[in-house]
Amino acid sequence: MASGKSTMASAKPTTCKEAIRRWEEENQQNAAAATEVILSFQWPPIEKMDNALATLINCEKLSLSTNMIEKIAGIGTLKNLKILSLGRNLIKGFAGLEPLGDTLEELWISYNCIEKMKGIQAMRNLHVLYISNNLVREWNEFARLQELVNLRDLVFVGNPLYESLEVEQWRLEVARRLSSLEKLDGEPIIRTEENPIQLVKTDSPSHDLLQEPV
């Protein structure tokens, strides 16, 4: 048993370069030519995003979910990237995403350690944001989302701010603040001239139903 623990403790994190090599072997494909690359569930987990990711020049969807990444890095040159999946890591903020502000359309970053929303306003083209089960607790942090004029689909369930309100009150507050939003926590928001905000009646959303795919 002791030797097993020692082996785990001494195992080095998987590098992005190694994860890409594994992906190429499994898929019999050159990663630089691929439009979708999945580097999720690495063992030992990836701890650092680095410049090896810059080789994924044609990538439109990149997944690094379920690792132990703390900071976003190494993807600033991926101008074709439209969907980035970083769920189930240890990420605390949005620094590192700024160069993708005009091109990234979907960010899946649920189950991380994000408390402050600083930097999200740089993602001008974002249509979809899955940020459930993080640590956001203040409306003044949430307010940064008001600058994302293209945001249509938001999943925010599981944050302390969400937990502090009844579901119906939460949905009314968000719909009022984000006038372009069409879908919140998996349920549509319907607006008409007579009634600017109509909310589909729903029970408290299931956290499992709102988990984004890999």
What is each PLM-predicted segment?
Residues 69-72, 91, 114-117, 136, ...:
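Hydrophobic aliphatic residue packing
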Residues 54, 76, 121, 146, ...:
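Alpha-helix boundary recognition
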Residues 7, 97-99, 128-134:
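Short, mixed-charge, low-aromatic patches
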Residues 1-68, 80-92, 99-106, 152-214:
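The feature captures the LRR N-terminal capping module
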Residues 46-49, 72-75, 94-100, 117-120, ...:
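Canonical leucine-rich repeat
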Residues 107-162, 171:
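Extended, charged alpha-helical interaction scaffolds
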